[in-house]
From Swiss-Prot:
Name of the protein in question: ATP synthase subunit delta
Record lineage: Bacteria, Pseudomonadati, Pseudomonadota, Alphaproteobacteria, Rhodobacterales
Function noted in UniProt: F(1)F(0) ATP synthase produces ATP from ADP in the presence of a proton or sodium gradient. F-type ATPases consist of two structural domains, F(1) containing the extramembraneous catalytic core and F(0) containing the membrane proton channel, linked together by a central stalk and a peripheral stalk. During catalysis, ATP synthesis in the catalytic domain of F(1) is coupled via a rotary mechanism of the central stalk subunits to proton translocation.
Family under the similarity heading: Belongs to the ATPase delta chain family.
Keywords: ATP synthesis, Cell inner membrane, Cell membrane, CF(1), Hydrogen ion transport, Ion transport, Membrane, Transport
One Pfam assignment: OSCP
Gene Ontology cellular component terms for the protein in this record: plasma membrane; proton-transporting ATP synthase complex
Species for this entry: Paracoccus denitrificans (strain Pd 1222)
Gene: atpH
A GO term for molecular function: proton-transporting ATP synthase activity, rotational mechanism
Annotated PROSITE patterns: ATPASE_DELTA
UniProt subunit comment: F-type ATPases have 2 components, F(1) - the catalytic core - and F(0) - the membrane proton channel. F(1) has five subunits: alpha(3), beta(3), gamma(1), delta(1), epsilon(1). F(0) has three main subunits: a(1), b(2) and c(10-14). The alpha and beta chains form an alternating ring which encloses part of the gamma chain. F(1) is attached to F(0) by a central stalk formed by the gamma and epsilon chains, while a peripheral stalk is formed by the delta and b chains.
InterPro entries documented for this protein: ATP_synth_OSCP/delta_N_sf (IPR026015), ATPase_OSCP/d_CS (IPR020781), ATPase_OSCP/dsu (IPR000711)
Subcellular location: Cell inner membrane
Amino acid sequence: MTVANSASISADIAGRYAQALFDLVRDSGGIDALSSQIDDLASAYDASQDLRDLTLSPLYDRQQQEAAVGALSERMGLSAELANTLRLLARNRRLFTLPQFVAKLRNLIADAKGEVTADVVSAQALTDEQKARLADTLAAKSGKTVKLNARVDESLIGGMIVKLGSQMIDSSIRSKLASLQNAMKEVG
């Protein structure tokens, strides 16, 4: 099995659990609460090496994983639906898919709200006004509300790279210089 196949299988597994939880929560009208809880869970996962170890290490058995996510859910005040889904992931030895589970849930929630996320990499930090104008422009093109994930990469020299769904717009000076360099190689 290749790494790509393994990642695809993990995403597929996570997608099934995420879809089931999303359907359950959507029917009860708790999408906004779920969105907030998923953000909290993702932050906890990113901040805690112990939590990442718990989800990835084969040294923990089902009962230990289930007890740990149960305690975590209670401490974080997660909804019964999310807590039970996390316990089920642990019971079925699927906690390793937690990052894909969170990503899939975020996508489902964004689709339900008519939102799309744009990843923006710029050479300098964008001002709030620039972010608002960019979000408005992208919203006009996509017909959906746009949330920006902005980060800075000084190696771009200037400009930015915007990824919206499957589209990418690269207006960075670094890419323009690379194109110019390639064009000069063809001439000379």
